[in-house]
Each structure stands twice: as C-alpha cells, then as structure tokens.
Amino acid sequence: MPLLLSGRVFRRDLDACGCLAMHVPLEGGSETRLLRRLRAAGYRTQLSSARGLGDPEVFLFELHGIRPPHLGHQSVGRNGAVGEVQQVMPQLAELFVDNAPVVLWLLEGQVLSRSELLALCDLCKRESRLRVVVEMGGARSLNWQPMSTLLGD
C-alpha cells in the first residue's frame, strides 16, 4: 500500500479539491495514519463528529450560543422562555493563527444533508487554507473522491 507509506497522493488530491468524500474500512486505522502524515507535512488538523454540527460556518468560525439539556430540572424565573444560552468558542478559531493549512476531518458524514455538504464545499472555496475531509461511510478499502463529484455538481 504505497498510499499509507507517504500520503502524497492524498495530500495532492486534498489540495486540488479542498473538500473530499472518503470511504474508509470499518475496522479503522487508516484515517489516523493519514492524519498523522498530514500533521507531519505541516497541516493543522481537527477531528470532529458531523452529528450535531448545525450550520457549519457558524459552528466552525463564529462565537455562537447553545442550549444545554435541562436534564429534568426547571429553572423558573432565572432565564427566558427559551432556556439558558451558553456561548461557545468556534472550533477552528485557534487553528488559523498562522499560514499553515487546516484540515477538518468529519466522522459520520453520512448524516449530513446535501445542503450541509455543499456549505462545507463553499467554505473551502472561500477560506483558502481550509481543507475538509468527510467520512461518508464504510468500504472494503480506503478510497476518496471530490465532494463535488459525489454530490453531482
């Protein structure tokens, strides 16, 4: 497997496309090897789950509010009718401090809708340093394709 030795082909495709859809073997291991090779090549990486992502641009780049679960407790009179809102720092803010390219690796990407996947592709086009890899499910062998090819654009 020459791909796992250097990761050069994967890096070249990632830089050319910006947003890749990936199918990985279910036993795992290949994604961590690729992440390790990306880090060694000077990329900054963030591994995250696609579940609960919401609006990708706001979640990744802007300060935003979340509502924690109430766990059965009632907060009568302390907060508004919508409940407590906590401010959360954006996930990718600290990774953009220098000119190194940033790779966002999303697990369980098959739960994302077509519009959310298109929004991730648009983010890669607008922010030149951002690269996105979305795991779209399992396969017998490691393979990837540009997200635009998967979506049919």
UniProtKB/Swiss-Prot annotation:
Main location: membrane
Compartment(s) where it occurs, according to its Swiss-Prot or TrEMBL record: Cellular thylakoid membrane
EC number(s) stated in the UniProt entry for this protein: 7.1.1.-
GO terms for cellular component: plasma membrane-derived thylakoid membrane
Catalytic activity: a plastoquinone + NADH + (n+1) H(+)(in) = a plastoquinol + NAD(+) + n H(+)(out); a plastoquinone + NADPH + (n+1) H(+)(in) = a plastoquinol + NADP(+) + n H(+)(out)
Membrane topology category: Peripheral membrane protein
GO molecular function: oxidoreductase activity, acting on NAD(P)H, quinone or similar compound as acceptor; quinone binding
Family matches, as InterPro entries: NAD(P)H-quinone_OxRdtase_su_N (IPR020874)
Domain of life: Bacteria
Keywords of the record: Membrane, NAD, NADP, Plastoquinone, Quinone, Thylakoid, Translocase, Transport
Subunit structure: NDH-1 can be composed of about 15 different subunits; different subcomplexes with different compositions have been identified which probably have different functions.
Family listed: Belongs to the complex I NdhN subunit family.
PANTHER family per record: NAD(P)H-QUINONE OXIDOREDUCTASE SUBUNIT N, CHLOROPLASTIC (PTHR35515:SF1)
HAMAP family recorded: NDH1_NDH1N
Protein's recorded name: NAD(P)H-quinone oxidoreductase subunit N
Originating organism: Prochlorococcus marinus (strain MIT 9313)
Gene: ndhN
